[in-house]
UniProtKB/Swiss-Prot annotation:
Organism: Klebsiella pneumoniae subsp. pneumoniae (strain ATCC 700721 / MGH 78578)
Family recorded in the similarity comment: Belongs to the RecF family.
PROSITE patterns in alphabetical order: RECF_1, RECF_2
Location of the protein in the cell: Cytoplasm
Keywords: ATP-binding, Cytoplasm, DNA damage, DNA repair, DNA replication, DNA-binding, Nucleotide-binding, SOS response
One Pfam family hit: SMC_N
Protein name: DNA replication and repair protein RecF
An annotated GO BP: double-strand break repair
Gene: recF
Keyword Phosphoprotein belongs to the record: no
Taxonomic path: Bacteria, Pseudomonadati, Pseudomonadota, Gammaproteobacteria, Enterobacterales
GO molecular function: ATP binding; single-stranded DNA binding
GO annotations of cellular component type: cytoplasm
Main location: cytoplasm
Amino acid sequence: MSLTRLLIKDFRNIESADLALSPGFNFLVGANGSGKTSVLEAIYTLGHGRAFRSLQIGRVIRHEQDAFVLHGRLQGEERETAIGLTKDKQGDSKVRIDGTDGHKVAELAHLMPMQLITPEGFTLLNGGPKYRRAFLDWGCFHNEAGFFTAWSNLKRLVKQRNAALRQVSRYAQLRPWDLELIPLAEQISRWRAEYSAAIVEDMADTCQQFLPEFTLTFSFQRGWEKETDYAEVLERNFERDRMLTYTAHGPHKADFRIRADGAPVEDTLSRGQLKLLMCALRLAQGEFLTRVSGRRCLYLIDDFASELDDARRGLLSSRLKATQSQVFVSAISAEHVMDMSDKNSKMFRVEKGKITD
């Protein structure tokens, strides 16, 4: 599925834009602050319901406006789908699909699987475990129909359990929450373990192409001891959890650890090497989705040239072309992306929120 049309209104510094897009490569070229990243962010927001540079809705809506409006047309092999998202300063969203309201943001996310590569994306590698959980959960969401509901219920139950820990004095008082929490936790952990085991070979192969000088290993940590029932862990750690006033073990504490030559990648790799690794992981995940489901990702790449030499840019470009996916790339200069361009590509110039092709 590719995004053939994008309408943007009052998003960041873009007052209004109507873009006809290529199903292949789309380049956004302009100076820093011109609005090229805002176009990428509009696409991301249309598929996620939130921006990637700020969680504060007031910073995303154009100055002195009440709401932003995003519309898109998705072209699949058999049909076209119209999608829309409106969000106001109070954070209230309206999702429209094929002319009908009342839809959920998760439906947009399912329609538009996308991979985001930005200069801020290093958190996948040097940030906390929550970023690597999100990496796994993206794959589980697109691979398991029941994942999103289970994950949402897990978040709710952990929050309720943490609140209850401040009020109870005996474990028996907490058991009603745990009876609901335990099967959800075990199911989500199984899905994550199965997904990580299935994709690890693809990741290793892709990472070897981008970083042949390192041996990379991947390990999923589910958030509590191996070979131990989650029910036993919760009961055994009740007093400690009550003292901490939060649940210290569970899938909400899981991690996906990545090592280079046996050491954490954040301690071993340079910033340029970390960007290569991030690109390799996102690419491998998108390719895996295509291989197992036949669905293709959209790739959003901000500041393409930064910290990549010509050879690495060429490698990333060739791998992206091989996916036959739709790709959006921002760059300061057209020279940085000319080698990626072909007869099916589109080049957009961005200046002070105005976009021309």
